[in-house]
Curated annotation (Swiss-Prot):
The lineage of its organism: Bacteria, Pseudomonadati, Nitrospirota, Thermodesulfovibrionia, Thermodesulfovibrionales. This is Chaperonin GroEL. It catalyses: ATP + H2O + a folded polypeptide = ADP + phosphate + an unfolded polypeptide. It is found in: Cytoplasm. The keyword Nucleotide-binding applies. Keywords: ATP-binding, Chaperone, Cytoplasm, Isomerase, Nucleotide-binding. Its main location: cytoplasm.
């Protein structure tokens, strides 16, 4: 086991401060509409150009171990905020630095660090309550576009694309971000339920030009086992052939005699049919088949519930207005399921999302939710170069996360104004002692930092502008750093999601409080690299 080095008390906290300062200086340059770029070296390929705070923070590792601890703690603030709210990482970093730096002055002067932390926590609770009062719900497409635009560094086209995508697939829909092949950034909408299984045999194709099988006003047979013999399928196929309606068969697999018979009947024009494999695996497959059954108003034909394939009636089949199958995907449009049952299933999946601890399971549940709730949208990000593409894709993902957060908890005035307006909420709180009161003063001062940094990044003197904003009684009055003028932030479309602002402050205060109450730092003593011995003269 390697030997350890320890430092205590004020020396430990000062080392943390050095690391926090270095990381914050790198990250805060990206804040606001006039934020600067940070260029990050890559081992291979072109450097990464970014204005995303968490991307910068994740790249920083300091040589000095004690300073690095401080940097890593604040890095945690940025990544936690990104995980929960999807944006606000730079704001969180700036707030954590401001709270810690100010708090350290009082701790060094003899204040009780535990009381300071209690005061900070109490003040943050009051600010969060005030944010909820200021917050207003997002009601229309225009506001969604504004949130997206702000988060994408004032790129209006990205904001409008995200608003369009949300309008089409709803707030529970899945919106994915992909790299496009060309220079244009486009939006593709997949309406209905799509799953990643195509036709089992190309003989099922009905549109040879597009290599698709299209079934209009079709029945859907859903089975959870393999179908290999024809005698089980025969009764239901005869009924459907008499009705002259198309049929989609979804099963674990269709093979041998059963597949051959379906293909022959399709080619002879006796039956318009297509077979696809069931999506997913194991328990997830059962759940997805149940989703398809609920969406189409059918029943999963499973021996688990006493249903056999040879006894299937037309009433057990699902129905859909249109089904499109290509070699990779099946899309079911306008299933005939009972809307109440679909809503009940959506609620059930939402509960599972809240309860699961696995990120992978959560992602898969959200995909299922979206497929039931109305569809999938895909934003294809195009750019001239690979470096620009990566930077733009990161901005689109940020904007998408911020927009979701806005729909969830509403919006507040942007540009750091909302936090500044929350200062007045701290004047009403009663504290048990003077040190706790100081904790609230620390938070009060820190609430000014984001707006100051946004203005400073625009190359303007911040102090006078902040005072002018404070003096104005209109809660939405603030400074547009992009246009360099005073405006009503809500009317100008400069808005932040409440969830992003709240999460940034809570995470910043949490980590700053931990650092203030730190007394000892323990790190490994770095081993000196041993130099190789001098070569023997006889070697030459």
């Amino acid at each position: 086991m390697a030997a350890k080095q320890l430092i205590f008390g004020d020396a430990a906290r000062q080392s943390i401060l050095k690391g926090v300062t270095l990381l914050t200086d790198a990250v805060k340059a990206t804040l606001g509409p006039r934020g600067r770029n940070v260029v990050i070296e890559r081992k291979f390929g072109s450097p990464n150009v970014t204005k995303d705070g968490v991307t910068v923070a994740k790249e920083i590792d300091l040589k000095e171990p004690f300073e690095n601890m401080g940097a890593q703690l604040v890095r945690e603030v940025a990544s936690k905020t990104s995980d929960v709210a999807g944006d606000g990482t730079t704001t969180a970093t700036v707030l954590a630095y401001a709270i810690y730096k100010e708090g350290l002055k009082y701790v060094s002067a003899g204040a009780n660090s535990m009381d300071l932390k209690r005061g900070i926590d109490k003040a943050v609770e009051a600010v969060v309550e005030e944010l909820k009062k200021i917050s207003k719900p997002v009601v229309d497409k225009k506001e969604i576009a504004q949130v997206g635009t702000i988060s994408a560094n004032n790129d209006v086209s990205i904001g409008e694309l995200i608003a369009e995508a949300m309008d089409k697939v709803g707030k529970d829909g899945v919106i994915t971000v992909e790299e496009a092949k060309g220079m244009a950034t486009t939006l593709d909408i997949v309406e209905g339920m799509q799953f990643d299984r195509g036709y089992i045999s190309p003989y099922f194709i009905t549109d040879p030009e597009r290599l698709e099988c299209i079934l209009e006003d079709a029945f859907v047979l859903i089975h959870d086992k393999k179908i290999s013999t024809m005698k089980d399928l025969l009764p239901i196929l005869e009924q459907i052939a008499r009705m002259g309606r198309p049929l989609l068969i979804i099963a674990e697999d269709v093979e041998g005699e059963a597949l051959a018979t379906l293909v022959v009947n399709k080619l002879r024009g006796v039956l318009q049919v297509c077979a696809v494999k069931a999506p997913g695996f194991g328990e997830r497959r059962k759940a997805m088949l149940e989703d398809i059954a609920i969406l189409t108003g059918g029943t999963v034909i499973s021996e688990d519930i006493g249903l056999k394939l040879e006894n299937v009636k037309v009433e057990d089949l699902g129905k859909a207005k249109k089904i499109i199958i290509d070699k990779d995907n099946t899309t079911i449009v306008e299933g005939a399921g009972d809307p109440q049952k679909i809503q009940a299933r959506i609620k059930q999946i939402k509960v599972q999302i809240d309860e699961t601890t696995s990120d992978y399971d959560r992602e898969k549940l959200q995909e299922r939710l979206a497929k039931l709730a109305g569809g999938v949208a895909r934003i294809n990000v195009g750019a001239a170069t690979e470096a620009e593409m990566k930077e733009k894709k990161a901005r689109v993902e940020d904007a998408l996360n911020a927009t979701r957060a806005a729909v969830e908890e509403g919006i507040v005035p942007g540009g750091g104004v909302a936090l500044l307006r929350c200062q007045k909420a701290l004047e009403k709180i009663k504290f048990e002692n003077h040190d706790q009161q100081l904790g609230a003063e620390i938070v009060k001062k820190a609430l000014e930092e984001p707006i100051k940094q946004i203005i400073a990044n625009a190359g303007v003197e911040a102090t006078l502008i902040v005072e002018k904003v404070k003096e104005n009684k209109n809660i939405n009055y603030g400074y547009d750093a992009y246009a360099e003028k005073f405006v009503d932030m809500m009317e100008a479309g400069i808005i932040d999601p409440t969830k992003v602002t709240r999460t940034a402050l809570q995470n910043a205060a949490s980590v700053a409080g931990l650092m203030l109450t730190t007394e000892v730092l323990v790190a490994e003593i770095p081993e000196e690299e041993k130099k190789p011995p001098m070569p023997s003269p006889d070697m030459y």
